[in-house]
Structure formats: structure tokens, C-alpha cells
Amino acid sequence: MIWVAVVITMLLFILVAKPTGIYLEKAFQGSKKLDKVFGPFEKLIFKITGVKEYNQTWKQYALSLVLLNGFMIVVVYFIFRLQGVLPLNPAHIEGMEPTLAFNTAISFMTDTNLQHYSGENGLSYLSQLIGITFLMFAAPATTLALVMAFIRGLAGKELGNFFVDFTRALTRVFLPIAFVTALVFVALGVPQTLDGAVTAQTIDGVKQSIVRGPVASFVSIKELGNNGGGFFGTNSTHPFENPGQMSNILQMMLMMLLPTALPFTYGRMVGNKKQGRILFVSLFMVFLLGFITITTSELNGNPALNAMGIEHVQGSTEGKEVRFGTVFSSLYATVTTAAETGAVNTMHDTLTPIGGLVPLVNMMLNTVYGGVGAGFVNIIMYAIIAVFISGLMVGRTPEFLGKKIEGKEMKLIAVTILFHPLLILGFSALALSTSLGTDAISNLGFHGLTQVVYEYTSSAVNNGSGFEGLGDATTFWNITTGLVMFLGRYFSLVTMLAVAASLKEKTVVPETVGTFRTDNGLFGGIFIGTIVIVGALTFFPMLVLGPIAEFLTLK
């Protein structure tokens, strides 16, 4: 039965992707029906905020994005610092320490949701609602807006206006879907209240304080926006965030909903639906490979414990919730790192070496399918690299969507693709070279190295999950991961928007017999190969020194 449930879940991922992709295209391309429903409210927002609906250049678009996000970071930072004297604080939680507030504000504005605090004990209700939940809407709306401008540029159209796209992302996508799914989560047993903790008496006669709060509304946007941060410190392992298998499947569907829809949106917007389907299928094959790998590893159990004769029929159950089991815990770990969400229903630090390698590789690739918007930008970056390499091999000028890929575009892409490895490996080396970093490691040897690299990888690609054996609630880790999150988020968004703007100005080259097609199985294979060769091999030495070496040691 468990495998039937897995297949049904996978089919649900596939079935909802195309309709959602069609809806996104209509939401941002001026559907008359949607304009009638949402238009009056949006125009009121534009009037109050003074937004004028005009087409921006790529520099204006990028500057608007960065400035608005920067302003939000500052506002939320002060909410965290002052929460002790602000209302909606029934637990009387004190203001955050400066570096932790810095880290947390950047974490949620960049859609990372890395948490160096425990949710129920570190934030007041005001901070959870006005600070965290607000950014959980604003962060994915930012990148969904940007990816629409990015696709318009690839299609040779005007980029649009950031503030208009940002507003539409909120009013037409995130608010309505999050509202409906929050009600579903309430029906499934997730609490939604502004009352404080309650005191219960256990069967042993001991009094226990049970924390609750506006959890359902938090969880819906947490998953839909690929945010991933937990209302509670234990995230989606907590029964109030994820009561059972139905809520577990719904959370995975929400995580995959927008990332899997964007290839179809892209295909419709650029006038090549088949290319969108090829991208979707190619990435789903990589996703399946990751799921099969992690599930096989976890079901085989820990080799060291197996050698001691310990029963392992259920696989490696360390760090997993019994109500989800090994298979669905493995699927959740694959989904949350493929969609760059970072929510967890099992502790990733307790995964087997190869089991832990899959989430790490998913994040390093940042394309399968990646987070809302930002992941799809990376997908197209790899697609352009695949076209460029193919063109060089046959001696033709590379073309993508009928436009020549030349030096300017490839220089921007080269800088972008090198930036993330430099961030991840550079800061990992810094942490390993000082006691400020190594003192946080709870496991010596290969696993300790993986803990450090996982933390910076998760920060750079805005995932937010962690190997939580790492003691990262220190000034060093707060500042360094904060910088990595900020740079990892905005650098690639700006450079790839510049690539789209450059292609927008180019004329379409007529298709000939010798044109390399990007909407067939051959391109899909080359695309996957490019991701593996360029993406995975960049980090291969680290993977050998970390999870692979740990696996061989246990064997």
C-alpha cells in the first residue's frame, strides 16, 4: 500500500503542474477574466502606494526588487529586536540578539528560512505574523515576479514593472491559494489561534505547557512559497504542523506546485510548449533518480548497525516519525530539497551517508526544480549552457529560442555559475579554518565536514534545511550564513535578468535544417548531462570527502 500511495502522490505532482502553469501565464499576461476579479483591488493598491504601471528596464526592475527587499529586511529586523515591548506576546519572549535578528530577517526575506532559533520559544505572535508570515508572502512573490520578467525577456517582450508583477503574485497566486489551503490544514487538525499556551496534565500527573498559535496560516504559505521555516523548532515533524499522512502529502504538493508549473508557463509565454514539456520531463527524471537513491539507502538501514545484528526491516528509522515511515520521509526529504523549501519531517542529520547525499546534491544543483522563480532561472541557465556546448561541438553559433548566444550572455552565465560554488566552498573553508566554525561541529571526521558544507549550501541556494547537529546559533554562524544567503539570492537573480534583457534586444534568426532543436528528447538528454557534468562535478571532490567517504567507512 505504501508504494501505491507514493505513486498516487507522484501522479498528483504531475497532474496539477500543467493547469497551474496555464493559470500563472494568464495571471501575469493580462487575462480579462482575472483582471475583472483582481483588477479593482490591485488598482486600489497601486493608487495608495503610488505605483505607476510602466515598463521598466532590467536595471530599474532589478533595483526596484533589491531596494524593496532591503527595506523589508530593515523593518522586520527592528520588529525582531523590539518584540519584547511590542503587543501579541503572551509568552513574554524577549527581543532577539542583534546578529540573530540580522540572520533571521535576511533568512526569511531571501526565502531561505534558515532558523538559528526555536520557533515557539524565539518569536512572539507579532513577530510570527507581521515579521515571518509577511516575509513568507513577500519573498516568493519577489522571485515569481522576477521569473515572469525573465521569461518575457527571453520571448523578446518588454520586461514589465516589478511592483505590478509583485502585487499580482500576491493577489492572484499566494493569497488565494494560501487562504484555501490554510482552511484545509485546520480541517486536518493544524491549530489556528492567537491564544497563548495551555497547561495540560499528563497521564503521569505531570503538568505540561503546550504551545499553540496561528499555525495553519503559517504552514500553508510556508510550503506554497517554498519557504520552509517552522512555527515550531522541530518543523514539520511536530504534530501541530503536520498531524498525519494527509497533511504530509498536501505539504509536498504545495512545495512542488509552482516549481513544476513554471516549465509549462514558460512554454506558453515563449510560444514553444513542447520545450516546456521537455524541461519538465527531464527534471522529473532527475527527481525520480534522487528519490530512488535516498529511499534505497534508507530502507537498507545503517551498515554499522546491520553488522551488529540489529533488526532493520523498516530501514534506518533514526530521526524519523513513525506516522510517516521511512519511504514517505525519504520522499519528503527529496521534495523539500528539490523544490528548495527546507521544511523537514525527518532530521536530515540522521540520514544514512548516501541518504544525506541526495538532499545535498539537490541543493547544489538548484535546478530540480528549484524554488519559486529562482529555480527556474537556474534551469534556463543550464539550458543555455547545454545549447552553447552543443553549438561549439558542431561548429555552429549557439541559438536559444532563435536568438544567438554570444560572448556577453556567456560571460554573465559563467560568472553566475561560478559564484555559488565560490560562496559555498569559500565560506566552508573559512569555517573549517577557525575555532569559531569548528566548535559548532558535533561529529568529527567526514560527517562533520558534511554538516558545515550542508549549512552553507542550504544558505547559498536559499533552502534553509540543515544538519541540525551543527551548533549554529552563534555570532559567527549568524553573520556568515546571513551574508551567504543575501549574496546567493540577489547576485544570480540580477545577472540572469541581465541575460534575458540582452536576448530581448536580439532579432530572431530564421530556423534552418541545421538549427539545434531544444524541444526534443536529444536536447533533454544533453540538458540532463549538462546539469550533471557542470553542476554535480563542481562539488564532486567535496562529496567524496564528505558523505561518500563516510559511506565507505561504514561499509
Swiss-Prot record:
Entry's Gene Ontology molecular function annotations: P-type potassium transmembrane transporter activity; potassium ion binding
GO CC terms, sorted: plasma membrane
Presence of keyword Membrane: yes
Keywords attached to this entry: Cell membrane, Ion transport, Membrane, Potassium, Potassium transport, Transmembrane, Transmembrane helix, Transport
Transmembrane feature ranges: 2-22, 60-80, 130-150, 173-193, 246-266, 278-298, 374-394, 412-432, 483-503, 525-545
Bilayer disposition of the protein: Multi-pass membrane protein
Cystine connections: none
Keyword RNA-binding: no
Cell compartments where the protein resides: Cell membrane
Function of the protein: Part of the high-affinity ATP-driven potassium transport (or Kdp) system, which catalyzes the hydrolysis of ATP coupled with the electrogenic transport of potassium into the cytoplasm. This subunit binds the extracellular potassium ions and delivers the ions to the membrane domain of KdpB through an intramembrane tunnel.
Quaternary assembly: The system is composed of three essential subunits: KdpA, KdpB and KdpC.
NCBIfam families according to UniProt: kdpA
Family affiliation: Belongs to the KdpA family.
Protein name: Potassium-transporting ATPase potassium-binding subunit
The organism of origin for this protein: Bacillus cereus (strain AH820)
Lineage of the organism: Bacteria, Bacillati, Bacillota, Bacilli, Bacillales
Gene label: kdpA
